[in-house]
Amino acid sequence: MRVSSLTAPRWLLLLALSAAASAARAEPAVDPCGTFNSDVRHERALFAGQAQPLAAAKAAAGAPAVTPEHLYQLQLHQRAEVTFALPPAQRHPPPAAGYAGLVTLEVDAAGLYRVALDQAFWIDVVAKGVSIQSSDFEGRRGCAAPHKIVEFMLPANTPLTLQFSGGITPTLTLAVTRAPAAAAHH
């Protein structure tokens, strides 16, 4: 259609619609990592750093230790090769073809801690043969720094096993952090 064949109101309408469409495309997209309900600035800062490579274990015995405030890139195993300390408490059983692995953790002070991951994996924390229930969790599609954060009340000076299962990739980025004081009171 030629512009000269359009009446002035139609031409102006077409111009306005075109400008609106261009403006809509130019608006910055919402950062999915910025939409967590909790303050996750600390975890985001950790995820911006260099991850330490670490091979997760196939069983709790001999599982490598992780420490809070560090970023790890875990190398996982086929789920069928992993023997869990306890069966994963996932409501929907993960596919047998997925990936899994175990690490250990011990914290000096009891309190609320966050386990942050770069993708969707199920997390179990086991202490003395008993599963510690999570107290809260959040996840954001489109955000890998971090994608998922699960909070647990952890006991001090107690060997803990962190079990990861249900993922579809052979690697997983992990950080454990102390939850901010405000999060500990909700």
Task: Specify the residue positions occupied by each region the protein language model found.
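Non-catalytic extracellular/lumenal accessory regions of secreted precursors
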Residues: 27-97, 183-186
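Beta-sandwich interaction modules
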Residues: 101-105, 143-157
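Edge beta-strands of jelly-roll/beta-sandwich modules across compartments, strongly enriched
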Residues: 168-180
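Noncatalytic modules at the cell exterior or secretory-pathway interfaces
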Residues: 111-113, 152-168
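N-terminal signal peptide c-region/cleavage motif recognized by signal peptidases
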Residues: 20-24
